[in-house]
């Protein structure tokens, strides 16, 4: 037998705990009430009617969770959409894509529900989305039934819709359609999930010789990092709708929306999570053609603007749409879950727009950067780290890069605070001045790549304790 081997005694020791700085204060989330706007009837687009109701999708009794918008014009509206690129596209995204393709880029309106995303819900989810669309269309006056109703949903992923409750409410919705400012505001509330305020904007502008109007609604506070494109094949979660009474052809509307979304909604992020349901729908019904003397009745006499046939008017419309979409997109960031800061990341002097956009998104999605903004900590090394790992087609040259904090309008000294110049850190950064700048609700970080003339802006928010609290109990 082999000799026995003595078993060594095992000595156990307590592992010392690692000291970690703890927050001594929890900042309250700023009030968002000043972002809620109401509008007079004259500013809202002509030829649309809206309605909303409670369909028992949300748990809170009476909470608006189902809404519709319909173009009341004889001719269906031109319709365009930018939709999520997530491979797990929700059923309403699939249905909307098919309706836009079969309708030749025209639609009568849309139906939206909040509280349930109808995403990853299989064959039944698709059937439910189609039933929502078809039921709205069947309830409209006979002259408005020739083309489909688009569908949007937002809420919890993987749960079935209470479809019977939804369908039973649609006749009531259609009967209550009107164009009052209150109904528009209520419609914006029917989009909300974790949002803290309804997001409605409207304005008018000149398009050629005519005054046209545009209104927009969006929602979103978490699961925000959109990457949306046109329906595939060519023709939020973040949800949004933009309705205008301008006359724009479907191809021109899709082209303008692609341009606008890539410079607005695709340039926001709250938490870096792309939703299965992200959708921006744009409708243009041409009802601004001519105002009659009685009330708000219209005669549709505007020729539809095309990209090649009306290049100057198209460019004006595209820029107005971009600016309007940017304002709507920024509302989502300002309502970011638990957010206390609104942060603009501006990357300039890049070799291409795509490079500038990619660098700005890397910074905006960095959890370390976002927590530093919450802590009002001028830790600019986290900015450089995010710049450095950005995958770009053109290589970033470290000794060309400069970084600055840009003071908000409320700070007495408007001079940018330079942190890094041509890859070299500033020798004596004024930490007191940095604290003053970072104490503001609105912040801006400027990154100069020193290697071109292109620029992009991305908007984000900070990460707070409240973000974890909200998302840790989302379904409860």
Swiss-Prot record:
Identification of the protein by name: Arginine biosynthesis bifunctional protein ArgJ, mitochondrial
Family under the similarity heading: Belongs to the ArgJ family.
Site (Cleavage): 236-237
EC number: 2.3.1.35, 2.3.1.1
GO cellular component: mitochondrial matrix
SUPFAM superfamilies (alphabetical): DmpA/ArgJ-like
Post-translational modification: The alpha and beta chains are autoproteolytically processed from a single precursor protein within the mitochondrion.
GO MF: glutamate N-acetyltransferase activity; L-glutamate N-acetyltransferase activity
One GO BP annotation of this record: ornithine biosynthetic process
Pathway(s) this gene product operates in, as recorded in its UniProt entry: Amino-acid biosynthesis; L-arginine biosynthesis; L-ornithine and N-acetyl-L-glutamate from L-glutamate and N(2)-acetyl-L-ornithine (cyclic): step 1/1; Amino-acid biosynthesis; L-arginine biosynthesis; N(2)-acetyl-L-ornithine from L-glutamate: step 1/4
Record key words, sorted: Acyltransferase, Amino-acid biosynthesis, Arginine biosynthesis, Autocatalytic cleavage, Mitochondrion, Multifunctional enzyme, Transferase
InterPro entries xref list: Arg_biosynth_ArgJ (IPR002813), ArgJ-like_dom_sf (IPR016117), ArgJ_beta_C (IPR042195)
Misc. remarks from the entry: This protein may be expected to contain an N-terminal transit peptide but none has been predicted.
Function according to Swiss-Prot or TrEMBL: Catalyzes two activities which are involved in the cyclic version of arginine biosynthesis: the synthesis of acetylglutamate from glutamate and acetyl-CoA, and of ornithine by transacetylation between acetylornithine and glutamate.
CDD domains membership: OAT (cd02152)
Binding site for substrate: 193, 219, 237, 337, 471, 476
Catalysis performed (reactions): N(2)-acetyl-L-ornithine + L-glutamate = N-acetyl-L-glutamate + L-ornithine; L-glutamate + acetyl-CoA = N-acetyl-L-glutamate + CoA + H(+)
Protein's cellular compartments: Mitochondrion matrix
Binding partners and assembly: Heterodimer of an alpha and a beta chain.
NCBIfam families on file: ArgJ, PRK05388.1
Species whose genome carries this gene: Cryptococcus neoformans var. neoformans serotype D (strain JEC21 / ATCC MYA-565)
Site (Involved in the stabilization of negative charge on the oxyanion by the formation of the oxyanion hole): 154-155
Annotated active site: 237 (nucleophile)
